């Protein structure tokens, strides 16, 4: 499942008429970097893209273009409109995951969940292979800088790679490992989404669910190598475009 229902107001006016995952970076839409890295993942049949009423038709058009360009793609796309029309009535990322799981009856499936504005260069084959058989696995990335980590979910892991501490946007970070928005959830974990939301927890940032979950179930980690870039502003968008254009050259 690709999360693409946000409104990216910090990137206005670029995202007034185009969803953030459809913005071009390094010669292709951000979401294509995600989808291309799914190639070869075993047993992947359907990629659900959850979006909003404003951009659903844009994602439909994009998915048709993608499949006509890349004939023989192993999976099909299903675009899900969450019905929201603005930042004021959005369901939030965790709300969207629960919405799709319920609507599409995915409660008995293992689910790979990825934020649609995640820019990373490594194939997800190894991540999925590592995650199979676990209740929950989250991708982590070493940002290499104690100042940079203050913008993200900072985690500590034990010798087995299980999360022992998770702090969102820490003032005093412990290490430089960031939890990033690439998740693998089993049916046992998907059933807890409703519990989490019913308790009035934050429905928006997907990392908040992991922060709640790790105290209840073991959450495994897998470190992503290569490049991972967070697109939160026009400046980081331009920087990402520059970096990925060079990588493709």
Place the predicted regions along the sequence by residue.
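Conserved donor-nucleotide/metal-binding helix-loop-beta segment in metal-dependent transferases, i.e.
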Residues: 122-150
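Short alpha-helix within the catalytic core of nucleotide-sugar-dependent glycosyltransferases
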Residues: 35-36, 60, 121-133, 190
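Conserved N-terminal catalytic core of the sugar/cofactor nucleotidyltransferase
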Residues: 2, 10, 24, 28-113
């Amino acid at each position: 499942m690709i999360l693409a229902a946000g409104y990216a107001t910090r990137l206005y006016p670029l995202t007034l008429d185009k969803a953030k995952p459809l913005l071009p970076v390094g010669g292709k839409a951000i979401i294509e970097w995600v989808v291309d890295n799914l190639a070869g993942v075993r047993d992947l049949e359907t990629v659900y893209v959850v979006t909003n009423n404003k951009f659903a038709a844009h994602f439909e058009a994009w998915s048709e273009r993608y499949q006509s360009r890349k004939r023989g793609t192993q999976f099909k796309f299903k675009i899900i409109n969450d019905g929201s029309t603005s930042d004021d009535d959005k369901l939030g990322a965790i709300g969207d995951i629960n919405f799709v799981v319920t609507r599409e009856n995915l409660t008995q499936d293992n689910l790979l969940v990825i934020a649609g504005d995640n820019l990373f260069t490594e194939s997800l084959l190894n991540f999925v292979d590592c995650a199979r058989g676990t209740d929950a696995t989250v991708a982590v990335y070493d940002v290499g800088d104690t100042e940079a980590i203050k913008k993200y979910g900072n985690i500590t892991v034990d010798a087995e790679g299980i999360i022992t501490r998770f702090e969102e946007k820490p003032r005093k970070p412990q290490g430089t490992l960031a939890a990033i928005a690439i998740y693998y959830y089993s049916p046992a974990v998907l059933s807890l989404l409703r519990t989490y939301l019913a308790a009035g927890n934050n429905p928006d940032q997907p990392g908040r669910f992991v922060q709640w979950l790790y105290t209840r179930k073991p959450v495994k980690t897998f470190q992503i190598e290569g490049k991972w870039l967070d697109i939160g502003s026009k400046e980081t968008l331009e920087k990402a475009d520059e970096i990925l254009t060079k990588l493709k050259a």
